[in-house]
């Protein structure tokens, strides 16, 4: 999918880019796989803001995605490649030979009319899903499960990929895009290939209104707030932070504070941390 560059007909259009959607084959989603999606605007069940800078934006329907890929031995034909407003990756509508329809994350190179299949005996071909133990070393994968049967949780964003490095007993070593090397159970499934729409990260939003269409609200600097709104607020003119280190709006240290649980059980499964050389 290429990048479309706009002419500077207005200030908002200057430097603006977008995807050309050349891979998208239809703009009409499969109705049976749509669910209504209520805008939460960053609020929890108590009505309190738990995620800032969210709200507004275009109304969306949620597309039910098959992250489990557990219909073993049943072939499916790719019918369409579609845009999904709820994620950076594109999605593909597949029709199984038993009549079931499903959406999957569209990997790079997947084409309409292509046949895909899941199961331990599936070929090592883009779009096929297999247990990690059955995938050869060096293969690039995405949509990786962390618990067998739960569905893919890792490597689902546009352009993301991971690589199978080897096998140790019942675990398989996988190198994630961050550089982290992690042990994952060999019975967990993964899909062959890289997630498509890899140029999505190169898009220049161009103007504030386009972020608002996506449901992203403005981010205000703490230094321009009042003291009752942020630890950096107050003072005369452009005042410094006034603290030993920058703080979050709730007074916790910002920039560099480690937030990972030191007793995380998954520590024993991480062979190399992402920030290790």
UniProtKB/Swiss-Prot annotation:
Superkingdom of the organism of origin: Bacteria
A molecular function GO annotation: transferase activity
Keywords: Ribonucleoprotein, Ribosomal protein, RNA-binding, rRNA-binding
Biased composition (Basic and acidic residues): 264-277
Disulphide connectivity of cysteines: none
Any single GO CC term annotated in Swiss-Prot or TrEMBL for this entry: large ribosomal subunit
Gene Ontology terms describing biological process: cytoplasmic translation
InterPro entries from the UniProt entry: NA-bd_OB-fold, Rib_uL2_dom2, Ribosomal_uL2, Ribosomal_uL2_bac/org-type, Ribosomal_uL2_C, Ribosomal_uL2_CS, Ribosomal_uL2_dom3, Ribosomal_uL2_RNA-bd_dom
SMART domains, sorted: Ribosomal_L2 (SM01383), Ribosomal_L2_C (SM01382)
Region (Disordered) location: 219-277
Pfam families (UniProt xref): Ribosomal_L2, Ribosomal_L2_C
Similarity comment: family membership: Belongs to the universal ribosomal protein uL2 family.
Function: One of the primary rRNA binding proteins. Required for association of the 30S and 50S subunits to form the 70S ribosome, for tRNA binding and peptide bond formation. It has been suggested to have peptidyltransferase activity; this is somewhat controversial. Makes several contacts with the 16S rRNA in the 70S ribosome.
Subunit structure: Part of the 50S ribosomal subunit. Forms a bridge to the 30S subunit in the 70S ribosome.
Protein name per Swiss-Prot or TrEMBL: Large ribosomal subunit protein uL2
Species for this entry: Streptococcus pyogenes serotype M1
Lineage: Bacteria, Bacillati, Bacillota, Bacilli, Lactobacillales
Gene designation per UniProt: rplB
């Amino acid at each position: 999918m290429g990048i479309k560059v706009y002419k500077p007909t207005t200030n908002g259009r200057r430097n603006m880019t977008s995807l050309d959607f050349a891979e998208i084959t239809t703009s009409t989603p499969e109705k049976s796989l749509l669910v209504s999606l209520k805008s939460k605007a960053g609020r929890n069940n108590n009505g309190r803001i738990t995620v800032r800078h969210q709200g507004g934006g275009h109304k969306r329907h949620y597309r039910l995605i098959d992250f489990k890929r557990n219909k073993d031995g049943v072939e499916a034909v790719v019918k369409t490649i579609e845009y999904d407003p709820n994620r950076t990756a594109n999605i593909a509508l597949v029709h199984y030979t038993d009549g079931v329809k499903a959406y999957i994350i569209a990997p790079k190179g997947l084409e309409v009319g292509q046949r895909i299949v899941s199961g331990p005996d599936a070929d090592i071909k883009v779009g096929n899903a297999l247990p990690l133990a059955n995938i050869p070393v060096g293969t690039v994968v995405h949509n990786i499960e962390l618990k067998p049967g739960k569905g893919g949780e890792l490597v689902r964003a546009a352009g993301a990929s991971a690589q199978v490095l080897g096998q140790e007993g019942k675990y398989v070593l996988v190198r994630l895009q961050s550089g982290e090397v992690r042990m994952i159970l060999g019975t967990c499934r993964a899909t062959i290939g890289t997630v498509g729409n890899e140029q999505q990260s190169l898009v220049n939003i161009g103007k504030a209104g386009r972020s608002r269409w996506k449901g992203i609200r403005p981010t205000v600097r703490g230094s321009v707030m009042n003291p009752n709104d942020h630890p950096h607020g107050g003072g005369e003119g452009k005042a410094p932070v006034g603290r030993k280190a920058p703080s979050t709006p709730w007074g916790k240290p910002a920039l560099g504070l480690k937030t990972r649980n030191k007793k995380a059980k998954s520590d024993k499964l991480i062979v190399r941390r992402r920030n290790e050389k």
